[in-house]
Each structure stands twice: as C-alpha cells, then as structure tokens.
C-alpha cells in the first residue's frame, strides 16, 4: 500500500503529525496489514505512531515509550518540558530514577539534560532527544528505539500503549486585553495556589496530586495558554476551566 508517493511539491494534508491530519493512514491501518505506522513532520523531529487497529498511539507517549526502553537498559535521569505528560515522571520513578522538568523549547530541554546527565529526554509533541546519538530531537532515532522496545516486549502496539499510565490533556487559552498585566495575574495565581507544588521557570505550573495545570503567556499577543492533564478527559478540561475562571476574575 502506498500513500502520497507522487512528488507534486505540495503536501497532501497539513504536515503536522496530529490525528486530525492523518485520517487516510489511520484508515489504511484498520485493514490489519501492518503492525505500526510512523508519521513524522517535514524536518523529522516529531514522531507520531498509529497502532495496528488504526488508533493514534498518542504523541505524548512517544517519549514515554522510548524512555521505558532506554531506562530498562541504561538507568539514569530523564527530562521533558513542563507541558509534557506526567507519564514520563511515572515511568522514570518506576526505575528508581529522577525526572526533571525544563522550560518549553528544545534548547531548554537539552540544557537541562546536560545539567542533570539525563539518558533520555524530549518534548511531549513527539520529540525524542537521545544523547547517546546527539542532543537534538530526532524522529528516526525515536523509531529505532521504539522498534527495539516493541521487539523486546513482544506485544502489539496497542497493548504496549495500554501498559502505560493513562493521562489525558486539554489545551485552552484565555484572551485578555493589551492593557492587562499578564505577569501580575500569573503572580496572583501562584499566590492563590501556593499550598500546591509550583514551578515558575516558564509561566506557572500547578501540580496537584492527581492532575496539573500549566499557564504560559504569549510573547506576541495578550493571551494565557492553559494546558491541563488528568486521569480523564473530563477532569483535564474541568481543572483547566476552573483555573481559567480564576484568571478571568483576576483580570477584571
């Protein structure tokens, strides 16, 4: 089976490897002729997978799965950015190792990785950074590590995905006026939730025992991006909306 093999100079769909852009290959996978599909972006630094049943593996779980394999063979620390899934922390702790969070951005992740001597790291958008190869996001390295792990585990791709902690993410934004002092609002939110675990190296991240919310201001427009994660989609959306209401009240 082949898809889009005619080099016309145009992408057949939005090249960002997200579920909404990958309907054709997901349908192809439902035919049961392949064990896994790999999808990369144009510069091959983001990796998404599709299971044998045609369902998305989940971009956030690319790094989690690769880290599971690396940690099993090379114990050490891990790093991802503040907006990435908590599942990496869980897998890291399973091996008795330390997880560290960095500010968003590849350069921030790699700087933190070097600082703590991480054996694997990356970003939740499917970006895998494997220092034993090089300090940059590399989807081909990610594919090699994923296939190695799949071979060692002897599972279907969907079974492998089901073996990891289940988290769901919600992404929202609060639109403010140009006159709004966004930094002051973030400082007030931080104060309101001071009894929770707070990280302010890149906006404000509030870590609750069973969920988290990460607030980041835009440098180009008066908005605050709100990322949240919890054990169900509903809980992730609920905590995100809750914090958004707090922001809107503070902005009045």
Annotate the PLM regions.
Residues 1-153, 160, 166:
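Phosphate-binding chemistry for phosphorylated carbohydrates and sugar-nucleotides
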Residues 153-252:
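Catalytic-core signal marking the mid-to-C-terminal active-site face
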């Amino acid at each position: 089976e082949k898809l889009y093999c005619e080099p016309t100079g145009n992408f057949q769909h939005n090249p960002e490897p997200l579920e909404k852009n990958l309907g054709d290959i997901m349908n192809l996978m439902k035919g049961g002729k392949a064990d896994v599909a790999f999808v990369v972006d144009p510069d091959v630094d983001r990796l998404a997978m599709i299971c044998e049943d045609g369902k998305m593996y989940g971009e956030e779980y690319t790094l989690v799965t690769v880290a599971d394999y690396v940690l099993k063979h090379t114990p050490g620390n891990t790093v991802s950015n503040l907006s990435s899934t908590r599942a990496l922390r869980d897998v890291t702790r399973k091996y008795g190792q330390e997880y560290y969070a960095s500010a968003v951005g590849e350069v921030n992740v790699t700087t933190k990785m070097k600082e703590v001597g991480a054996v694997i790291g990356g970003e939740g958008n499917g970006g895998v950074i494997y220092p034993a190869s090089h300090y940059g996001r590399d989807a081909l390295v990610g594919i090699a590590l994923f296939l190695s792990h799949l071979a060692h585990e002897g599972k279907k791709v969907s079974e492998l995905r089901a073996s990891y902690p289940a988290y769901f993410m919600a992404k929202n934004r609060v639109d403010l006026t140009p006159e709004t002092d966004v930094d002051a609002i973030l400082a007030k939110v931080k104060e309101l939730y001071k009894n929770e675990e707070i990280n302010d190296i890149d906006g404000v991240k509030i870590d609750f025992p069973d969920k988290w919310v990460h607030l980041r201001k835009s440098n180009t427009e008066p908005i605050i991006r709100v990322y949240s994660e919890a054990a169900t989609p509903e809980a992730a959306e609920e905590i995100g909306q809750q914090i958004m209401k707090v922001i809107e009240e503070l902005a009045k």
